[in-house]
Amino acid sequence: MSALKSSAVRRGSGRGSGGRRLLRWLASVVLLAALGWFGWLYFEINAVAEQDEARPADAIAVFGAAEYLGRPSPVLHARLDHAVELYREEIAPLVITLGGGAAADSGMTEGGVGRDYLLANGVPYERIVAETQSVDTDQQVARLAEIAQMRRLKSIVVVSDGTHLFRIRKLCEDAGLTVYTSPRPALGHIGDWDLAQRYFHEMLSYTLLRMHLDFGWMHGKDSG
């Protein structure tokens, strides 16, 4: 009787060990897959961030960032300056500024502030389209697609931060847009920690996007 009990215990223990081995194997596979995915994603984001694809197109689109009581933040300022430079180089005859404002704001919008800045820097009023309703990157792309369809724009140069452009391009492609990415110049030295945060934000945001998980706080506009 004792021998039978001992044999049963060994069989149960063997099944338990086998189950634990399977779980460890599955965990290893998931970990390796995640490392491979995020490694590929880092490479792709970095490749887009370091390449300026600006070329003749139908329009230039400036993705929104924070504005402070009617004044563009340093990040938005740099994006708009880059758009002005592209316009002066005759890359495109039209500049689209994207971005709305929070309910608690002064009533100003990123798109409206961008339009005013472009006007002050020599871009004619009739050459500017200000989009003022979107509240995040996804909505900016959706509104850009509507503008492109309405105005029959076949190609657009999109301007934003380098690390932001990979996700923008993928969203634009999903919306049926032909876009060329053009990163705005860096603002001074970016610390390793800040840069790592930017990459982490974009990698996680894009992953959630592809998993069809909607966490607005993860894929909003830049605040700087």
Predicted regions and their residues:
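A transmembrane-helix-recognition feature enriched in membrane-embedded lipid enzymes
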Residues: D192-D222
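Short, intrinsically disordered terminal tails adjacent to the first/last structured region
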Residues: M1-R11
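N-terminal type II signal-anchor transmembrane helix
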Residues: R10-D52
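Electropositive, surface-exposed helix/loop patches at the edges of structured domains
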Residues: W25-L32, A130-D136, D161-K170, F215-G224
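Coil-to-alpha-helix initiation sites in intrinsically disordered, low-complexity, charged segments
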Residues: G14-S17, R21, G188-G191, R198, ...
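A structural signal for short, hydrophobic/glycine-enriched beta-strand patches
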Residues: A3, W40-Y199
